[in-house]
Amino acid sequence: MVQTWKFPANWSTSELAEGRVRSEQLFRKERKEEGPRAFEEVYREVEPRVREALEVTGDLLNLDGQAFIYDPTIWRILRYVCAPPVSEEDLWTLVGQKFRTVPADLCDETAEVIREVLDPVRFAWVAEGRQPNETERESAVMATSALLALELLRTRRRGTASKRQEAEVAAALEGIGYVLDAKRGDIDVLDVLERGHFSKERKVAGAKCDVPIRLKDGRLLAIECKVSNGPKNSWKRLIRECGGKSETWRQHFGTQVMSVAVLAGSFDLSCLERAQNMDGLWVYWQHDLKALTDFIETIA
C-alpha cells in the first residue's frame, strides 16, 4: 500500500498578512506594558555593579590586572566602559583566548585592551589624568548603567520570549495527547523519539531544534520558535536561521521531516512568503497554535 503523506496548508498572501498584523498588535501591546518598568528593574540591578567597577579601578585611573584578580567576572561590566562597548567575542579576540572568568595570566593584557578603548566622552578625566568630580562620576555611572541595562534587557527578552513560545507549544501538544520525552540526546535516527512523543531543545541531525515531534505516521516535525522585533530582523530569524536548519534536516532525513516555524513579533510579509514558498518551511503563529494542533491531529 502506497503511503499518502499529509502536509500543512500553505497560507495565502492575505492569510499571512492577517496573521502578521495580529502578531504585531500583540507584540506592541506587550512592549508598551513592560517597556519602562522592565528597563528600570534591570537598570537598578546593574547600577551597583557599575559603581563597584569604578570603585575597584579607582574611577578607571588604576585599571590594571588586579581588578580581575579581585573579581574575575568584572570584565563583563568593564566591556561597557569602552567606546563603543566591546562584545564578548571581540574582547576574546583582542585578548587571544575565550574565557568565562579572566585567567590569571591574562589579567594584565585584558586590562590593557580595555584601557586602550575607554570612552573619552564618559570618562574624559582618565585621558586628562585627574580625579572626576561628582557630576562627572554620576553622569558616567548613569550612562554606563543605561548601556548595560539596554543590552541585558534585549538579551533576556529574546531568551524569555523563546522559552515562553516553547512552553506554549509544549502545552498545546500535551493538550492533544502527545507525550513529553525529557531525554536530551541527539536525534540522528527517527526511532530515537517514539511516535506520539515530543522533546525540547534537542539536536536533530547536528542542529538544535526547539521542539522536535515524532508524528504518529512516523515522520519528524521539527519546530523552531522565533521572535522578531522588526521586518529586517525577521529575515535573519526566519530565512537564515530556520531556513538553514530546514535544509540540514531535509538532507539528513529526506521526506521524513517537515520543518515548522512558530512565530511571534514583527515579520516582513515578503519574508513570510519566501519562507513558505522557497525555503520549505511551514509557518504558524504563536497566537494561533490551534491551527498547528489541528493539523497534527489529522495524522494518525
Predicted regions and their residues:
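Nuclease-adjacent, charged terminal/linker segments that flank catalytic cores
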Residues: 1-139, 148, 152
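Solvent-exposed, charged helical/coil patches
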Residues: 147-186
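Surface-exposed cleft-lining segments at the edges of enzyme active sites
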Residues: 149-158, 194-199, 229-233
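Active-site metal-binding core of divalent-cation-utilizing nuclease and nuclease-like domains
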Residues: 182-216
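Conserved catalytic cores of phosphodiester-cleaving nucleases, focusing on short active-site segments
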Residues: 211-213, 217-229, 242
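Short beta-strand-loop-alpha-helix junction that forms the active-site gateway
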Residues: 224-239, 264
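Basic, amphipathic alpha-helical patches used to engage nucleic acids or provide basic targeting signals
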Residues: 234-254, 276
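Domain-level recognition of nuclease-like catalytic cores that cleave nucleotide substrates
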Residues: 257-300
